[in-house]
């Protein structure tokens, strides 16, 4: 066929385009390597003879022109396919050949239809593609003429405006390919003489989608087409302007940064030459040296490490990672208070005054602090010590630590270790890691700027183990007086003296602390508060504190003693007073709302209107069973424990069923008690074979609470005996103690807390093991007042006390003592705490 001079360009339909794009995606996905040859502007189809239904009928007859040694495909007239021609009509000049792909020859690649991308641009190529002779489809075409003439005034004005925009774009965007294409089109002869060719050449450069281009091709109004091309050209120019503005801003910003950098470097060099200023490295070195001289460390090992790090800092480049590591290390080294100590307060009377002002009671803790200061006064300096405060939540353990620091005149720092599982939090991270830093102990010393502070390690019983190590083992070095004089943090890697630090640890349960760690502490117990103590705490501390926080005066809101008693008795039975403060806060908040709304001017809280402010009663009764029944006995643990035994009528044989969220220890205690009670019942009544014939169900109410104690042995035996004999245990009687298979009553731990619990629950008679007699001396007299305490050695003693009236054991009765009572009033023997 030779080299063609015209090409008929038709867009494929939208549906065909989607199918074709899916094929291209699948081909690209199947290729393992990118194509070695660049993609051409023609797309090859292998679908056989084209189907006219898959292409648009209106297209363009492009003209191949030669300019400046290149072949350029320029826009030509718009044509429309009218139908398929017969094979014999070969001489018709209005026929266009649509070729078919033929794969039977090795050098033939047939192009049937051109698929434009988002914009159709003039194609510049040194060689015009040759279309091989093959099977083809002839179609009839005719010009797609405009419906109106192009000589109107509007058309002329639009044509002039379009030409002005073209030349403006060429001048403004000279370096862009868009301007180069416009420039090549302007050089063609058709640019100056044919409006249609001009529009058909400019339009493809400005389109944004194939549908927009097809709409441009099918337009029959010259005026409308001029408007479309002109608007597309203006939009194209706006996009270029926006891109150029962004590029200009980036260029200006980059130039400004470079200029600032060069000027800064020049200024540094000039100041250095004039001796006005030193460089950054010299400034930092001078700062570290001046700090180190003020510290005056005498340890040779520490001095050697400091010198080596300073030499390393001098040899490193300022932008290297080693430089930053050395600088951070030296910063920590020079900020620690190596030889800084605060002066301790040796005035014992003043210390006692501060402790009594902040806390009432706590006799053992106050005596320990006073003796601690007395020893330091004789020595001339107060050394370190490790104290463990054990008690229920809300009893003021943290506030005690703050009061001790205030009394001694030392700095105070609190470290919370609850849930801690990484040893590095205690001993620091090694410097090989990124963003490494010292542990919490060294950080605390840097914060307080002294080497003898009071450090409170809070919730030490809640430390956990993990794959990162055991923090409890790391604390051994911190808290051991023989080791903490040379405590080595992994980050510092030099010894630091912690021997003069007063460590105060807090815990709710000392049993969960490892024995080696517990052995290094002096354990002080803070028991729970009874009702009278809670009332005093509310009057003396909580009410004034909440008044200050809310701004409500005493004239606006008052409390009667009966209301405070009801609040403590029916709403706040916890061992601490934190929950009591929450209820008082709630009352004051509701009162503040009423004052702000003008609903009330002043209110007096009484037992009658208390529920309006705090809601329904939380604890309607302190006892689960108001009426005593056989098989029910009351025991003491962390709270009141009722052991309930009943006959299981629907189970055959002598069996025992247990319920109530019982732990392994308590289940073993039930087994021991059941084995013993069968033998003991035969001794009491040989004819009673109750346990040999019947099945028993033992239950501990409040099943949502886990129970795992060994101190309920005598309680379980008494419950089973009460069921078997039908006898009732004396009212207001609670018992605690572990029983053996021979009936021996074994001592238990936490007897002080259990007596306090009994006092809080208004229990009048208590049975405890004889082995726990010494622990009674630790309980203040005002707590033991009004309670009968029986000391028993064997269960036979328990039986005679609980079920008969012929017991030979006399109770320990703590009656009112005027002398002690006056002393208590003078010394205010009521434990209290500041809620913070």
Swiss-Prot record:
GO terms for biological process: cellular response to oxidative stress; chaperone-mediated protein complex assembly; mitochondrion organization; oxidation-dependent protein catabolic process; protein quality control for misfolded or incompletely synthesized proteins. ATP binds at residues 391-398. It catalyses: Hydrolysis of proteins in presence of ATP. It comes from the Eukaryota. Keywords: ATP-binding, DNA-binding, Hydrolase, Mitochondrion, Nucleotide-binding, Protease, Serine protease. GO terms for molecular function: ATP binding; ATP hydrolysis activity; ATP-dependent peptidase activity; sequence-specific DNA binding; serine-type endopeptidase activity; single-stranded DNA binding. The active site is at 711, 754. InterPro entries: AAA+_ATPase, ATPase_AAA_core, Lon_bac/euk-typ, Lon_lid, Lon_proteolytic, Lon_Prtase, Lon_prtase_N, Lonm_euk. It is an enzyme of class 3 (hydrolase). It is found in: Mitochondrion matrix. GO terms for cellular component: mitochondrial matrix. Residues 627-805 form the Lon proteolytic domain. Residues 1-237 form the Lon N-terminal domain. ATP-dependent serine protease that mediates the selective degradation of misfolded, unassembled or oxidatively damaged polypeptides as well as certain short-lived regulatory proteins in the mitochondrial matrix. May also have a chaperone function in the assembly of inner membrane protein complexes. Participates in the regulation of mitochondrial gene expression and in the maintenance of the integrity of the mitochondrial genome. Binds to mitochondrial DNA in a site-specific manner. This protein may be expected to contain an N-terminal transit peptide but none has been predicted. This is Lon protease homolog, mitochondrial 2. It comes from Dictyostelium discoideum.
């Amino acid at each position: 066929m030779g080299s063609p001079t015209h090409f008929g360009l038709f867009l494929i339909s939208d549906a065909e385009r989607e199918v074709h794009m899916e094929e291209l995606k699948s081909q690209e996905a199947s290729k393992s390597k990118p194509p070695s040859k660049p993609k051409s502007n023609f797309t090859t189809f292998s679908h056989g003879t084209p189907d006219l239904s898959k292409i648009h009928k209106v297209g363009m007859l492009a003209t191949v022109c030669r300019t400046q040694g290149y072949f350029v495909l320029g826009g030509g007239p718009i044509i429309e396919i009218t139908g398929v021609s017969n094979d014999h009509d070969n001489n018709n000049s209005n026929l266009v050949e649509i070729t078919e792909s033929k794969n039977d020859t090795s050098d033939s690649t047939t192009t049937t239809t051109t698929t434009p991308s988002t914009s159709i641009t003039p194609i510049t190529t040194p060689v015009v593609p040759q279309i091989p002779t093959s099977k083809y489809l002839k179609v009839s075409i005719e010009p797609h003429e405009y419906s109106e003439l192009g000589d109107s005034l509007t058309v002329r004005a639009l044509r002039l405006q379009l030409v002005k925009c073209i030349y403006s774009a060429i001048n403004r965007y000279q370096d862009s390919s868009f301007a180069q294409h416009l420039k090549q089109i302007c050089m063609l002869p058709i640019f100056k003489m044919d409006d249609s060719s001009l529009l058909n050449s400019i339009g493809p450069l400005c389109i944004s989608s194939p549908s927009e281009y097809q709409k441009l091709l099918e337009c029959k109004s010259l005026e409308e087409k001029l408007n479309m091309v002109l608007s597309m050209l203006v939009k194209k120019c706006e996009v270029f302007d926006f891109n150029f503005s962004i590029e200009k801003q980036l260029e200006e910003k980059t130039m400004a940064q470079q200029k600032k950098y060069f000027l800064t470097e020049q200024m540094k060099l000039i100041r250095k030459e004039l001796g006005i200023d030193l460089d950054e490295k010299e400034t930092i070195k001078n700062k570290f040296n001046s700090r180190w001289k003020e510290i005056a460390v005498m340890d040779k090992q520490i001095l050697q490490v400091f010198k080596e790090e300073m030499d390393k800092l001098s040899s490193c480049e300022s932008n290297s990672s080693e430089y930053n590591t050395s600088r951070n290390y030296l910063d920590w080294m020079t900020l620690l208070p190596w030889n800084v100590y605060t002066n301790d307060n040796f005035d014992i009377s003043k210390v006692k005054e501060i402790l009594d002002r902040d806390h009432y009671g706590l006799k053992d803790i106050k005596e320990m602090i006073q003796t601690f200061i007395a020893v330091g006064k004789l020595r001339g300096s107060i050394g370190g010590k490790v104290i463990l405060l054990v008690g229920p939540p809300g009893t003021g353990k943290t506030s005690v630590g703050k009061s001790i620091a205030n009394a001694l005149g030392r700095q105070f720092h609190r470290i919370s270790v609850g849930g801690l599982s990484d040893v590095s939090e205690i001993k620091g991270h090694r410097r090989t890691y990124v963003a490494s830093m010292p542990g919490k102990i060294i950080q605390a010393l840097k914060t307080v700027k002294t080497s003898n502070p009071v450090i409170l390690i809070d919730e030490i019983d809640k430390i956990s183990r993990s794959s990162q190590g055991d923090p409890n083992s790391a604390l051994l070095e911190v808290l051991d007086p023989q080791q903490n004089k040379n405590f080595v943090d992994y980050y510092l890697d030099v010894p630091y003296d912690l021997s003069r630090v007063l460590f105060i640890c807090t815990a709710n349960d000392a049993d969960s602390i490892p024995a080696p760690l517990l052995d290094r502490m002096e354990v002080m117990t803070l028991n729970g508060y009874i009702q009278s103590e809670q009332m005093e705490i509310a009057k003396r501390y909580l009410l004034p504190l909440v008044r200050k926080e809310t701004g409500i005066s005493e004239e606006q809101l008052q409390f009667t003693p009966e209301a405070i008693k009801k609040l403590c008795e029916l709403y706040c039975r916890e061992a601490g007073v934190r929950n009591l403060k929450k209820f008082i806060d709630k009352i004051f908040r509701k009162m503040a709302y009423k004052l702000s709304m003008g609903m009330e001017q002043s209110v007096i809280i009484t037992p009658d209107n208390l529920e309006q402010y705090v809601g329904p009663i939380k604890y309607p009764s302190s006892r689960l069973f108001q009426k005593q029944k056989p098989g029910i006995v009351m025991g003491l643990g962390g709270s009141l424990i009722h052991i309930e035994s009943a006959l299981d009528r629907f189970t055959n044989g002598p069996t025992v069923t247990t319920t109530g969220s019982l732990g392994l220890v308590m289940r073993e205690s039930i087994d021991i008690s059941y084995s013993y009670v069968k033998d003991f019942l035969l001794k009491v009544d040989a004819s009673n074979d109750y346990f040999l014939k019947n099945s028993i169900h033992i239950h501990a109410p409040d099943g949502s609470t886990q129970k795992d104690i060994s101190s309920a042995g005598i309680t379980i035996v008494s419950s089973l005996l009460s069921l078997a004999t039908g006898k009732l245990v004396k009212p207001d009687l609670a018992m605690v103690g572990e029983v053996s298979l021979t009936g021996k009553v074994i001592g238990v731990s936490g007897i002080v807390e259990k007596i306090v619990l009994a006092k809080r629950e208004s229990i009048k008679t208590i049975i405890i093991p004889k082995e726990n007699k010494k622990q009674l001396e630790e309980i203040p007299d005002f707590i033991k007042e009004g309670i009968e305490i029986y000391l028993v050695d064997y269960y036979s003693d328990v039986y005679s006390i609980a079920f008969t009236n012929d017991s030979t054991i006399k109770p320990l009765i703590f009656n009112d003592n005027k002398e002690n009572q006056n002393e208590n009033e003078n010394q205010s023997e009521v434990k209290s705490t500041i809620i913070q």
